[in-house]
């Protein structure tokens, strides 16, 4: 028995390297410009895409000026029009903030309404989505729009329709979604390149240290305090 998902992961990694390098460079520049101009990262993923949002917010090795946009319902109402607009009442944005919205299909109203609000605030938006699958999907929003249409930069996770990618004999459907794995690669490379760009420009960005190493918590807390009014939820 082989390690089939490992094989798929290697194949997907190579595909992302070949197809997404330029988009990653563009996204990294937007992130670097935001942080160097007193902006913060704000990231949202509904349902399972929340896992990708916390890859760029509040974790060791990530940028400290960052905040996850939390969906209190955990994605349960993401397909209902108007819920995303209600969520924006809890948000604040400054023009130099940079937003990540992560949605595999990009068809649900919640993400689309968040994107509309983000653009109305004059902010840049990076969308992580399965572009081919999204372009063939029908929007669930009355505008007929899909999430990728609002993006300044699209990071295409190259996932297939329905996300699950592997077939097994005797099983009608497929198993093993790939969108989380590919989102981690895309987002972490984006953050790496953003930090690299900032250092090249003589700007030392605030980066989280692990709270599980000695002094890490104290180091993080001292820097978080400078951004407390922007990165913490009330």
Curated annotation (Swiss-Prot):
One of its GO terms (cellular component) is cytosol. Pfam families: SIS_2. Residues 31-205 form the SIS domain. InterPro entries: RpiR-like_SIS, SIS_dom, SIS_dom_sf, SIS_GmhA/DiaA_subfam, UPF0309. GO terms for molecular function: carbohydrate derivative binding; D-sedoheptulose 7-phosphate isomerase activity. This is UPF0309 protein lmo0025. It comes from the Bacteria. GO terms for biological process: D-glycero-D-manno-heptose 7-phosphate biosynthetic process. Gene3D superfamilies: Glucose-6-phosphate isomerase like protein, domain 1 (3.40.50.10490). Belongs to the UPF0309 family.
């Amino acid at each position: 028995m082989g390690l089939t998902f490992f094989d798929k992961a290697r194949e997907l990694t190579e595909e992302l390297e070949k197809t997404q390098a330029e988009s990653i460079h563009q996204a990294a520049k937007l992130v670097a410009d935001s942080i160097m101009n007193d902006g913060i990262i704000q990231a949202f993923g509904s349902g399972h895409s929340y896992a990708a949002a916390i890859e760029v917010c509040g974790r060791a090795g990530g940028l400290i000026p960052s905040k996850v946009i939390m969906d209190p319902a955990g994605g349960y109402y993401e397909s209902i029009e108007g819920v995303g607009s209600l969520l924006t009442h809890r948000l604040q944005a400054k023009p130099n903030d940079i937003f990540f919205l992560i949605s595999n299909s990009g068809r649900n109203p919640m993400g689309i309404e968040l994107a509309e609000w983000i653009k109305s605030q004059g902010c840049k938006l990076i969308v992580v989505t399965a572009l081919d699958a999204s372009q063939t999907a029908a929007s669930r929003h009355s505008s007929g729009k899909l999430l990728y249409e609002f993006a300044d930069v699209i990071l295409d996770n190259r996932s297939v329709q329905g996300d699950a990618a592997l077939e097994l004999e005797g099983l009608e459907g497929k198993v093993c979604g790939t969108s989380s794995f590919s989102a981690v690669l895309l987002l972490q490379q984006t953050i790496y390149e953003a930090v690299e760009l900032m250092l090249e420009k003589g700007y030392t960005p605030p980066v989280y240290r692990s709270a599980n190493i000695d002094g890490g918590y104290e180091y993080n807390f001292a820097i978080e305090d400078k951004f407390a009014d922007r990165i913490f939820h009330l």
